[in-house]
């Protein structure tokens, strides 16, 4: 074997790199990975770059330059190990020709506020990038590329995780245009020009990568179910790929929880209803509220339950950051709404203003873990007594 080059992008990439550096201590390797600020883990032989998430910054571009430089001019006997996890879309940025970092920031902000699913956002991002949608693997040719993936997307499609820098793109320019039109996205002129002219064309050729899934939402839910069963609870996994507006999903789950509590359907307590996936929050331009999709889901769930006895719930992002706040998520119980009102918070008003973080902070029911150094999407647990 020739050279071994380690590259990566995502909230878990530094932790993955440190583990690989330790396990392969007898292999001559080098490389560079990028992770979110505050998520770095020391690695002796692999350079760690920190950048901004969910909106990219100068270091996101610097990371792309360094990673592209690391894989250029490799030969057929060389091996590239790509460590990919959620968050890589904003951490690894190489704007399409004619676009700037400012353009990419504007695109990301428009996507994040639109209510689009993660799959839809990534379909647009791939068409505006010189590195996403398999282009990084093309740049590494003819070296062998092995991609180790931690999934944070519904359905675990590796082409969607971090916008698939080393995985063939199965979406098209027409898909991206349709998404922009459907969500009425206002994109900068340079991005509009790229889409109008057929998308980024930085690389051509077949994408070749051996992809291995090493962690996923379904694995996390299975582990949670095992812990629940060991503690005398009947676990029911409702799905690992749930999507939709956070407040709408919260309302639906309130109905499911009430059915379980009062009728024993789909399960009789003591039990726990588990689910994963990634909801979304559509934000009006003038929104000043604070909160992420997990706290908004929980506030909607609490309003739907309206103080029902014997039901508690927790929802959080497994990376430790719900949206852009310092909390992973929050938790609720039968007295949550009463405690909010006692603290001067009107729950329905807070939900309408997308201010769920403030509501849960007022009653000290935020869940704060700090960076977990992994990312397998959100996890929701509703306990039925």
UniProtKB/Swiss-Prot annotation:
Annotated catalysed reactions: (R)-glycerate + NAD(+) = 3-hydroxypyruvate + NADH + H(+); (R)-glycerate + NADP(+) = 3-hydroxypyruvate + NADPH + H(+)
Q: What is this protein called?
A: Putative hydroxypyruvate reductase
The UniProt record describes its induction as: By tartrate.
* Record Pfam families: DUF4147 (PF13660), MOFRL (PF05161)
Pathway field: Carbohydrate acid metabolism; tartrate degradation; 3-hydroxypyruvate from D-glycerate: step 1/1
Cite a GO CC annotation: cytoplasm
Q: What is its EC number?
A: 1.1.1.81
Q: What does this protein do?
A: Degrades an unidentified toxic product from the first step of tartrate degradation.
Q: Name one GO molecular function term.
A: hydroxypyruvate reductase (NADPH) activity
Which keywords, in A-to-Z order, does the entry hold? NADP, Oxidoreductase, Plasmid
Q: Which SUPFAM superfamilies match?
A: GckA/TtuD-like
| UniProt organism field | Agrobacterium vitis (Rhizobium vitis)
User: Does this UniProt record's set of keywords contain NADP?
Assistant: yes
